[in-house]
Amino acid sequence: VADTQDGTQDDAQSDAAESQAGEWKIGLAEFAAGEEMDRYDGFWWSPDSKYVLFETFDASHEQTWYIADPADPTKPAQARRYPQAMTANADVHLTLLELGYDTDGCYYGGIAHNVEWDRESYEYLAAVSWTEGHEPLLLVQDRLQQHDQVLAVHVGEPIVTMSAPENGFTDEDGSEVETFSIAIPEYAPGEEPGTTRVLEEHSNDCWLDLIAGTPAYTPDGRLVCAMNDMDADTNRLTVDGTPFTPKGLQVREVLDVTDDDVLCVVQRTPELLPAADLPFLWQSNADDHDARSFDVVSIRYDGDWEPLTYVPGQWTMSRAGDGCVVTGRGMDDAAMQMQHCMNVRADGAAADADDADGN
């Protein structure tokens, strides 16, 4: 902040100084991500716990709003950064942290790498996912949310620790102190940890709907993405770029992805998916499975699908191994319900992983 000749502060220089200092947050989602994109996480562990992706953002470019507490008139108004139309958003960055462990498995430090993408063209970090055995995935969008990119983040090789026990160093008690060194691999240009490559790009002249749970890898490495299919008037899913979910079954959320199927929350559009084409389980109450009902279904990659909830209502599900948990309520129910289900073989034992039909 500088004083002018008449003794007043130069507002332009004051703003520049404030912007340079910034209002940085680490490990949190910026306001636009949480409020508009349903992304509330700001850091993501790798499945093997050897890496961490974390967000940092500078909110100093956003407008400041002052919010009072109507229940407590004596309390001063609180300042909050708030993104507004036609003004700057938070400046979002992503960092890949490689974690180092000694020979006893104790953490001793890490190496940080900036995750690189075209942040000027794609300023929204809409989604992050990390599937075991695969690189992390990012979904980034432009300001108008008419274009997006699905990116894979290169993580490189894990830090290698080499122990050197006979070093002559001792602590204050005279005990020998183990020392070690780390081997940092060399990478070709463009393959360094934190670099990204584009897997898919999508465009829509109107608007690209976000579908929670996408993008995602199947365990065997196929890429599942959202598709706003304007020709079919349906929000669909693709696997390696090919749409496989039915016309008229609007995918609202992906709950789980396996090599055999995806578990989804869907809404049916009757004009596009008539009652005659519905599975037997929904035939008796087909008229109620429409945009009012959020149903859980399993959809295979060949397009076959089956409903996993029968009563129209608001439903979701989680599954792991041989079990699943269904939660929600029907349209006539005031209270939430929870059902635990287990896939069991005819002999009463839990089904094997390669015997998912329970026979």
Enumerate the predicted regions with their spans.
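Short loop/turn segments that connect beta-strands within beta-propeller blades
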Residues: 99-102, 155-158, 240-241, 300-303
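Residue position within the beta-strands of beta-propeller blades
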Residues: 51-55, 136-140, 223-226, 263-267, ...
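Residue-level detector of Asp-centered blade-edge/turn motifs that repeat once per structural unit
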Residues: 47-48, 132, 218-220, 257-260, ...
